[in-house]
Swiss-Prot record:
Name this polypeptide is given: Histone H1.0-A
Coiled-coil spans in chain: none
Gene (UniProt): h1-0-a
Function of the molecule: Histones H1 are necessary for the condensation of nucleosome chains into higher-order structures. The histones H1.0 are found in cells that are in terminal stages of differentiation or that have low rates of cell division.
Keywords linked to the UniProt accession: Chromosome, DNA condensation, DNA-binding, Nucleus
Biased composition (Basic residues): 102-164, 172-194
Alphabetized GO MF terms: double-stranded DNA binding; nucleosomal DNA binding; structural constituent of chromatin
SMART domains in UniProt: H15
Organism: Xenopus laevis (African clawed frog)
Any single GO BP term: chromosome condensation
Entry keyword annotation includes DNA-binding: yes
Taxonomic path: Eukaryota, Metazoa, Chordata, Craniata, Vertebrata
Amino acid sequence: MTENSAPAAKPRRSKASKKSTDHPKYSDMILDAVQAEKSRSGSSRQSIQKYIKNNYTVGENADSQIKLSIKRLVTSGTLKQTKGVGASGSFRLAKADEVKKPAKKPKKEIKKAVSPKKAAKPKKAAKSPAKAKKPKVAEKKVKKAPKKKPAPSPRKAKKTKTVRAKPVWASKAKKAKPSKPKAKASPKKSGRKK
C-alpha cells in the first residue's frame, strides 16, 4: 500500500511543473490584464479572469488562484483597489512611488505578525479612547450640576441680604445722628443771612 501511494504523488508533481511552464505567474498575468484594459476606474476581477483565460492556457483552479494573487498584489502595494473589498471590486496599477512605499511596509507587518505582544498593544490603545469618552460624559454631568446649583444659590443670597439689611439700618441710624448737628448748624447760617 505504501508503494502505491508514493508513485501517485510523483505524477501530481510533474503535472504541476507542466502547468507552471504553460503560463507565467498569476501576478504577472494579472498585471498584464490591468495594463491591457487601461480603464480609469480600474479593471474588475471578472475582466481580469476573462483576459487571462483568453490569452493564457490556465487550469480549472485559475479563478481561486487569481483571487489569491489579487489579494497578495493589493497587500504588497503593486495593485491599488479602487472599489470593493478583498478580491471583489476594481483594481488598477499603483504608481511607482506608491509601489516602493508599500514594499517596505510588508516587512514591518511580518515582524508584527511574529510578535503577537505588539499586536495586543493596539487593542489596549483602542480601549483607552473608549475610556476617555466615558470621562467626557462624566464631565458633562459635572458641568450640568453647577448650572442647577446657581439657580437656588441667588435665593440663598437674597436671604443673606435680608439678614445683612438689619446692620445696614443700624449704620444708617448712626449716620443720621451726625446729620442732626449739621441741621442745627444750618439754621444759624440762615439766621446770619437775615
